[in-house]
Amino acid sequence: MSSSFFSSRFADKVALVTGATSGIGRAAAIAYAREGAKVVVAGRRSEAGNAVVRAITDAGGEAIFVKTDVTREADIVALVSRTLDQFGRLDVAFNNAGWLGKLAPIAEQTNENYNEIFDANVRGVFWSMKYEIPAMLGSGGGSIVNNASMGGSIGFPNFGLYVASKHAVIGLTRTAALEYANRGVRVNTVSPGGIQTEMLDSAFGAGDTDHKKTMAELHPIGRLGSSEEVADAVLYLSAPGASFVTGHDLVVDGAFTVR
């Protein structure tokens, strides 16, 4: 990896990223590697995951791909086990995998959509932390960042189930932070606003420029964010420089939630 001022923040560290095949997860995986970490790229899509690994290794970094569906507990057990088998430790985890689901008012939502959203966004984060934390304790401590959303602190019409799931992620994170603060494991959330990703495309349609323009204009900063901007926030929370930061929700939303 090319050197930079911060190129050694994660030297000799092992970082695990779920949902790392695209968007914010991909950007974070590459950023961790750029700053010295060995990276475990986890996701459901093998071709995309291996492409992320190639992007890292072609630049001189070290990474592996582990096919993982966070809605399956056995997959997460296998993911953490493979991480320890390959690298011998786990120092950092970014639990990024999530699901937007179908958008509709509450009275029009379905049990099926509820289950799909909560299985990915809440149960997946719960299982991830459940197995990551013991691995980190065995490695002398570590840092977990869970991907929440600006929707985790506000309401948003038609996004009710997604919003509820992200409130839950923040609650789980704060509780875990309290439980492990004196044992060397920090736990925080990052809460992105409107970010130009595949998930946004799935909400509005890849070619729906009108809705995206409207969404961008709702942010006082006047635009949508980038995956790399969120990744920068994730790396801050993960790094030793944030050693006194735990139980915090870092909002990266261009002032959307303080309008």
Located regions from the model:
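Short C-terminal tail/terminal secondary-structure segment
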Residues: 2-6, 100-103, 154, 234-235, ...
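C-terminal substrate-recognition "lid" of short-chain dehydrogenase/reductases
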Residues: 126-129, 137, 223-252, 257
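Catalytic Tyr-X3-Lys loop
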Residues: 107-126, 145, 169
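Substrate-binding pocket helix/loop in short-chain dehydrogenase/reductase
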Residues: 76, 104-106, 110-118, 211, ...
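Active-site helix of classical SDR
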Residues: 129, 165, 173
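Residue(s) in the substrate-gating loop at a strand-loop-helix junction
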Residues: 149
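Conserved glycine-rich cofactor-binding loop
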Residues: 14, 21-22, 45
